[in-house]
């Protein structure tokens, strides 16, 4: 159900695949990321998926004694796609509200490997930071497990090189090879501790 109480917390928005038909290395990295988020006392925010890397990140956070908040549109709940073990589930009216809620709640973003939906979420966050819709102080970290995003990273570099985006905008995201590097990148961006965010969600 929708929770409208305002609260101030540090939450890390984790984008990632809903597919489970992937190599075990991706699942292990997602679970480790969730555990590391929990170890810092931060909330693991994701799309509430019951499969794939979203579930793995949730499981990692919960098994480490932390919390996980899932944000999911009603039609996905109706289809039985929501993970029942989440600490808190926020149901939205549609995909747009889902993405807005996750962005509003987050102190930082980590994009794990994923398909079109994950890439769209990550690039929308990148664009929102660029446009000032999202606070530019919220770091966006690409978790490049097994070099999964090498081609996308190269595409962004090419866009900057050919004048389709400002070269300075390349600094709006950070690349991490491992979950530990992702956490360290977030801490460096804030000078150690991420800033808690006040949200209506």
Where are the model-predicted features located?
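A cross-family phosphate/adenosyl-ligand binding-site feature
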Residues: 2-105, 132-133, 143-180, 184-185, ...
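Hydrophobic alpha-helical segments of small multi-pass membrane proteins
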Residues: 124, 140-144
């Amino acid at each position: 159900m929708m929770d409208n109480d305002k609260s101030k917390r540090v939450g890390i928005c984790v984008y990632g695949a809903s597919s489970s038909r992937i190599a075990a290395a991706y699942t292990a990295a997602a679970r480790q990321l969730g555990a590391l988020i929990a170890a810092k006392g931060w909330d693991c925010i994701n799309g509430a998926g019951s499969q794939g890397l979203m579930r793995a990140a949730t499981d990692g956070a919960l098994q480490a004694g932390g919390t996980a908040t899932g944000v999911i549109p009603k039609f996905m709940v109706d289809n039985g796609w929501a993970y029942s073990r989440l600490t808190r589930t926020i149901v939205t009216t549609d995909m747009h509200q889902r993405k807005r809620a996750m962005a509003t709640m987050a102190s930082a973003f980590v994009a794990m490997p994923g398909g079109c939906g994950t890439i769209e979420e990550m690039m929308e966050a990148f664009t929102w930071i660029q446009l000032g819709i999202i606070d530019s102080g919220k770091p966006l970290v690409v978790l490049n497990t097994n070099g999964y995003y090498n081609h996308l990273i190269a595409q962004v570099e090419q866009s900057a090189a050919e004048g389709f985006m400002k070269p300075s905008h390349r600094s709006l995201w950070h690349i991490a090879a491992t979950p530990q590097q992702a956490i360290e990148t977030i801490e460096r961006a804030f000078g150690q501790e991420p800033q808690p965010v006040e949200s209506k969600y």
